[in-house]
Amino acid sequence: MLLALAQWLQNDYSFLRVVNYLTFRAVMANLTALLIGLAFGPWVIRKLTELKVGQAVRTIGPQTHLVKAGTPTMGGVLVLVSIAVSTLLWCDWGNRFIWVVMLVTFGYGAIGWVDDYRKVVYRDPRGMSSREKFFWQTLIGLVAAVYLAFSVSESSNVRVWELFLNWVEGGLSLDMPYKSNLIVPFFKEISYPLGVAGFIVLTYLVIVGSSNAVNLTDGLDGLVIMPVVLVGGGLGVFAYVMGNSVYSKYLLFPHIPGAGELLIFCSALAGAGLAFLWFNAHPAQVFMGDVGALALGGALGTVAVIVRQEIVLFVMGGIFVVETLSVMAQVTWFKITKRRYGEGRRLFRMAPLHHHFELGGWKETQVTVRFWIITMLLVLIGLSTLKLR
């Protein structure tokens, strides 16, 4: 919005030309989201407390968590509003990738909101049924995946529609351009053609998987938001590179017109996340809830797909991956041993993994900060793939 206004007035006020610079708008988006979050955070927490939107805590978890019962949840609304206002103020409204990411982010946020609402109203920690939640995640994820399958390599929505029709008329068979290939980190000449179906399936898995992985990680004060900020910042760098024809050519990446604008979204995400951390740091004044975790995870997955860095997301978001795998391994091993021995056995003291360390004697703050440090290292490894190829 401000970009269009600045372009309209820049002939009379030359200093407004600075708004044309992507890096300037990214910095301003970050600061705007940060200030909105810090300014309205106390009010949001107070309102959530008045509405008795308190977190229900499972009694089977670490006993130290019982004191958290009643802490306001659904604080992710503050994060999403900060991101939305900041992004819409500083982005180019004509950029289609911005709207795709916003669709996924707020679509998944709506799913999380319903889930949190049911937990609060019915005092049931389970919230929405897994089947219902998965259905809506799948619907939104597939819509985004189908659109991105044809839009990543094309700059015109008209051309995207033509490619889609050609794909349908051709019996769901269509040659995809190089830009749609799966990029393998550290190898500049290795990429794998996915085809339309492969692209859609991979995109769906990345978006839905990332959303649920972030949600599973959100279990301790401040644990998930800092890794989200770090990974989002890393993806913002990739967005800037992929959207710049000079840098992408120099670094031997495919140029994706319009991808650079996602730097605005990632910057706003980082600013909103840091503002939320101000109130979510131990002892937390507010919890994110599914409304924030599902949305932010979906956002990271969508950005990663657009900038063709699905594998790098897997690396940078290693904490999310390990937390998810710990749950899968715990459930699988429990079922196998129950079938074999008549009683289920556990691989970990408790899943997700952060609870395993808590029950092993680590303080909550130790788990959180150590996971942050690991994420910092993983993000640096991910960023190193820009040049080490």
Curated annotation (Swiss-Prot):
It is a multi-pass membrane protein. Its EC number is 2.7.8.13. GO terms for biological process: cell division; cell wall organization; peptidoglycan biosynthetic process; regulation of cell shape. The chain crosses the membrane at residues 25-45, 74-94, 97-117, 134-154, 190-210, 222-242, 259-279, 286-306, 311-331, 366-386. It catalyses: UDP-N-acetyl-alpha-D-muramoyl-L-alanyl-gamma-D-glutamyl-meso-2,6-diaminopimeloyl-D-alanyl-D-alanine + di-trans,octa-cis-undecaprenyl phosphate = di-trans,octa-cis-undecaprenyl diphospho-N-acetyl-alpha-D-muramoyl-L-alanyl-D-glutamyl-meso-2,6-diaminopimeloyl-D-alanyl-D-alanine + UMP. Keywords: Cell cycle, Cell division, Cell inner membrane, Cell membrane, Cell shape, Cell wall biogenesis/degradation, Magnesium, Membrane, Metal-binding, Peptidoglycan synthesis, Transferase, Transmembrane, Transmembrane helix. InterPro entries: Glycosyl_transferase_4 (IPR000715), PNAcMuramoyl-5peptid_Trfase (IPR003524), PNAcMuramoyl-5peptid_Trfase_CS (IPR018480). Its cofactor is Mg(2+). One of its GO terms (molecular function) is metal ion binding. It is an enzyme of class 2 (transferase). Catalyzes the initial step of the lipid cycle reactions in the biosynthesis of the cell wall peptidoglycan: transfers peptidoglycan precursor phospho-MurNAc-pentapeptide from UDP-MurNAc-pentapeptide onto the lipid carrier undecaprenyl phosphate, yielding undecaprenyl-pyrophosphoryl-MurNAc-pentapeptide, known as lipid I. NCBIfam families: mraY (TIGR00445). This is Phospho-N-acetylmuramoyl-pentapeptide-transferase.
